[in-house]
Structure formats: structure tokens, C-alpha cells
């Protein structure tokens, strides 16, 4: 991806652990690499199709001076986040914050922290089979759409499906949402579980009924296997109620292990697997 580079932006701010750092202030320097597509701006010479690096510098200075932080890690994190939120053409950035006047009682050239942050593509499956199912789904998706570090991309239709896993219970309403997020996979999982709890989700029976179920299916092409999170979702290839809505909004997204697309996995499941999708008569959720 193309880059816009900013080097040595000088900012006077009041960050540091010691009281004198907060009181007197000191000079900080910022380097930034902005990852963006400059093609259209390069062909048309139109500023609105580019990222105004002057405005980026102004915003970084504003964020650095707006609050006082103990750690340069915190100052760098906040600065990177605000830039990514304010400039939609920037997909990713590298930011290095230098603190050359740090209170170190030995000769040194510089102290800095360097971070990389960016937007990530995630797919979340949603489902409900208790109470007012549409209400729970609408409320859950609304929570995700309104999260400051998430941007909704697409939401599938709602599919009526039979239960999966052998537990006798009511039919489900299921679908899939694509979003872009600045959250890490673990932060996104924490948010999904929080939204489930707010909807009264109780984990009493494995594959049992639930007011709201939110599963992280895919996160970029990441492969994660921990006690708390497995990505890609370990059973997604066996669930037509996941693959059908996923195929509707992103038929060519691929599984990181097998390389198979959602469309290919759904076709295989139609011939060899269980069928749970009953109909797709429901409209998309607002």
C-alpha cells in the first residue's frame, strides 16, 4: 500500500510520570507513516481524494496537547487512534513518539515508543431463539454499530434456522455482520460477550437456547488458538446457518486454514452436511 511519511513533527507537551514533567513540559517529536491508496489523488490532482497531511499534523499536535499522560505509550496510542478515526482513507499507520528530554540520569540520544495500528476486517455471526428474537438481534447489532472503534460494513438478511447440536428448543434467527474495527480480536470478543450479557445471555446448556449469541468468525486472516478465543470459528464450516448469510455478504472471503471461500464451503455442506436453514424471508435488520 502507498505511504505518506511525516518525520520530526515537533510538539511541546506535558507528559511524564514526574510532577516537574507535567509542570514544565518538554519537546516531543512524532514520526508517522500513513498507509493509504494515493492512486486516485495521483491521477486527478484533487486534494479531496487524498489525505491532507497538514491536517494530520494539526490533529496529532492537538491530541498530544489536549491531555496529560504519564506514559508516552498512552500518548502514542491515543494519537494513533484519533488519526485513524478522523481520516477514513488511512487504513493503517506506524507512529513513533520520541522523548529526547526524558529524565534519564545518564548520557543518551533518544527514547521512543513505536506502534502500528490499523483497521481490521471482522465477521460476526449473530443469533437468537428466546423471547423477542428480532429485538435482541437489533439491540445487539446496534451496540456494535455504535461502538466508537467499530464501523459496520454489511449485515446479511435474517435466516430462520432449526437448532444445531441436538438440543430440543425453538428455531433460531441467524445472520452475519461484517465490520471494520480498531479493536484487537480479544477486545472484540470481550465486547461481544458484554453485549450478550446485557441481553441476558446465560450459558447453562451447551448449544442450548439463548437470547443473543454473538460469535467471532473471522478476523483478517488471523489464526488464534487460546483458552478464551479460537479464530477462525472452529465449527463455521459445518454450519449452513453461518455460511449462508456469510456467503450473502462476502462469498469470496476465505478460510485461513483451508483457503476455501465461503461459497465453496457452503456448496460442500449442501452435499455432505446437515441442513438447518429453513428460509430467508426476513428482511435485513436496521
What do these predicted ranges mean?
Residues 7, 91, 151-156, 244:
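A short, local hydrophobic-aromatic micro-motif
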Residues 139-144, 188-195:
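Short amphipathic alpha-helices in soluble, non-transmembrane regions
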Amino acid at each position: 500500500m502507498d505511504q505518506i511519511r511525516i518525520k520530526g513533527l515537533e510538539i511541546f507537551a506535558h507528559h511524564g510520570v514526574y510532577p516537574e514533567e507535567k509542570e514544565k513540559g518538554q519537546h516531543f517529536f512524532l514520526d508517522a507513516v500513513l498507509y493509504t491508496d494515493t492512486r486516485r489523488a495521483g491521477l486527478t490532482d484533487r486534494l479531496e481524494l487524498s489525505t491532507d497531511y497538514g491536517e494530520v499534523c494539526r490533529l496529532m499536535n492537538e491530541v498530544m496537547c489536549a491531555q496529560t499522560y504519564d506514559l508516552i505509550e498512552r500518548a502514542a496510542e491515543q494519537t494513533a487512534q484519533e488519526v485513524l478515526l478522523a481520516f477514513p482513507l488511512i487504513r493503517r499507520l506506524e507512529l513513533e513518539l520520541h522523548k529526547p528530554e526524558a529524565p534519564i540520569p545518564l548520557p543518551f540520544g533518544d527514547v521512543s515508543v513505536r506502534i502500528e495500528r490499523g483497521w481490521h476486517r471482522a465477521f460476526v455471526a449473530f443469533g437468537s431463539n428466546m423471547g423477542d428474537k428480532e429485538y435482541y438481534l437489533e439491540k445487539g447489532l446496534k451496540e456494535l454499530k455504535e461502538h466508537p472503534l467499530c464501523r459496520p460494513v454489511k449485515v446479511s438478511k435474517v435466516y430462520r434456522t432449526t437448532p444445531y447440536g441436538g438440543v430440543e428448543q425453538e428455531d433460531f434467527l441467524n445472520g452475519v455482520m461484517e465490520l471494520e474495527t480498531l479493536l484487537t480480536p480479544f477486545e472484540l470478543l470481550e465486547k461481544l460477550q458484554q453485549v450478550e450479557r446485557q441481553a441476558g445471555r446465560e450459558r447453562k446448556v451447551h448449544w442450548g437456547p439463548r437470547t443473543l449469541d454473538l460469535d467471532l468468525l473471522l478476523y483478517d486472516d488471523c489464526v488464534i488458538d487460546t483458552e478464551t478465543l479460537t479464530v477462525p470459528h472452529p465449527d463455521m464450516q459445518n454450519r449452513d446457518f453461518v455460511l449462508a448469510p456469510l456467503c450473502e455478504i462476502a462469498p469470496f472471503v476465505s478460510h485461513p486454514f483451508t483457503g476455501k471461500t465461503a461459497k465453496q464451503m457452503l456448496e460442500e455442506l449442501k452435499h455432505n452436511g446437515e441442513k438447518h436453514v429453513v428460509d430467508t424471508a426476513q428482511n435485513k435488520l436496521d
